[in-house]
Design a protein with these regions (language model features):
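Short N-terminal edge-element motif at the start of the domain
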Residues: 48-148
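Bacterial N-terminal signal peptides that target proteins for export
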Residues: 2-11
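Short helix-loop boundary/capping segments
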Residues: 145-222
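Intrinsically disordered, low-structural-confidence terminal and linker regions
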Residues: 27-42
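Non-catalytic macromolecular-recognition regions in eukaryotic signaling proteins
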Residues: 70-75, 80, 161-164, 180, ...
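Long, compositionally biased interface segments
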Residues: 29-32, 212-280
Length: 280
């Protein structure tokens, strides 16, 4: 293994350790003064950061990397979700507030303001440790170029033989409703299914607009415009919200190979153009 590969592996191990706690929040908050800039400035030398307003194509970050292959040509390695949308778009632009430590922040779907009483009816029992009807969630289907099986955290996207993979995140924002006619999360989850030799979700959301694809990073509240994520990720974010039956994601939270049972916090929206890659 070369010296560069050793550095990459050490970096990925550090990020993986944090991911197992907060899932895709990445980061080891490096205290190296060269990496963490003074308050008010931005971190430098990194590729474009995520999340972003996908309706804006503007970005001046000069770091370029090759986009990951289509999800169908990669292995699904993790599924997790965040309370409120990390990204912003016209369809999910209602600001949830500043929150604390990544919780009670982010963006909500516009359709969440026009739900019926039946859709807002409380489900029986606890859902994923606190989800309620009317809530917005952003689901991430994480894919890797490594030959691995799905499992908990970013560690499942790596292996000893594949320490620097291509990563792709397919993304959908949902409004939770108590309606069996809404989308069933079981239809979008993973159940040991493979297609053409690749681990795949049963399906990915359709009919929610053409996904916006761009170069970005891992997300989550451990990162900010002063503390950048070092991992390079190809993002594919659908621009429209969809209604999801809250009972079905509640069932998924009870048992899944990813050991996910709750919503994760969000990273503050990245707005400085120097930290954003241009969207083609």
């Amino acid at each position: 293994m070369t010296k560069i590969q050793n550095v990459k592996l050490a970096l990925l191990i550090a990020v993986t350790a944090s991911f197992l706690v907060t899932s895709m929040t990445g980061g080891a908050q490096n205290e190296d003064k060269n990496m963490v800039m003074e308050a008010g400035s931005i971190c430098e030398g990194y590729a474009g950061q995520t999340p972003r307003d996908i309706d804006s194509k503007t970005g001046t970050n000069p770091v370029v990397f090759e986009l990951a292959p289509p999800a169908s040509d990669m292995n699904l390695c993790n599924i997790h979700f965040h309370k409120n949308a990390e990204h912003k778009a016209e369809a999910f632009s209602i600001y949830a507030g500043d929150g604390k430590d990544g919780y009670d922040s982010g963006y909500q779907c516009g359709i969440s303001e026009n739900l019926t009483a039946a859709e807002l009816a409380a489900p029986a029992g606890d859902i994923c440790k606190g989800l309620e009807t009317g809530d917005t969630i952003e689901v991430h289907w994480v894919h890797t170029s490594c030959d691995v099986a799905p499992g908990p955290g970013l560690g499942s996207c790596l292996s000893d033989a594949c320490a620097n993979p291509d990563l792709r995140v397919e993304t959908q924002v949902f409004t939770l409703v108590n309606d069996s006619n809404a989308l069933d999360f079981n239809d979008l989850s993973y159940s040991n299914n493979q297609v053409n030799g690749f681990h795949q979700a049963k399906a990915l959301p359709e009919n929610t607009g053409l996904p916006v694809e761009f170069m970005g990073s891992t997300t989550g509240p451990s990162y900010s415009e002063q503390i950048c994520s070092p991992l390079q990720v190809t993002w594919s974010v659908r621009p429209q919200c969809a209604k999801l039956d809250i009972n079905t994601i509640g069932k998924w939270c009870e048992s899944n190979v990813f050991e996910e049972d709750h919503a994760h916090g969000v990273r503050a929206l990245v707005t400085d153009e120097r930290l954003l890659s241009p969207i083609e």
